[in-house]
């Protein structure tokens, strides 16, 4: 699987942005409390955005760019997502 950037909506309404090369495994880690400290105790978690990248460096650059966006801009990005993920492609 190629690298990508994802956004999760936490149970408290906040958004978390991260990168992975295995989205199903990473989502399971977050949901089991083995993901980022930020998402622990903030469930339930919902995937609201996924974007494929060519490699880890590209994914990291895109993650940084997304983290610079305002919440409104992140919400617009999430709203534009068509729902395709590595598990359904």
Regions found by a protein language model. Give the residues of each.
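GIY-YIG nuclease catalytic motif and its immediate N-terminal context
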Residues: 1-53, 57-89
């Amino acid at each position: 699987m190629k690298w990508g950037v994802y956004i999760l909506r936490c149970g408290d309404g906040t958004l978390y942005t991260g990168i992975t090369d295995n989205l199903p495994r990473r989502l399971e880690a977050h949901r089991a409390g083995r993901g980022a400290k930020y998402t622990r105790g903030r469930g339930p978690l919902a995937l609201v955005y996924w974007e494929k990248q060519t490699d880890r460096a590209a994914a990291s650059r895109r993650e940084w760019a997304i983290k610079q966006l305002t919440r409104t801009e992140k919400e617009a990005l999430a709203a534009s997502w068509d729902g395709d993920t590595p598990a359904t492609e």
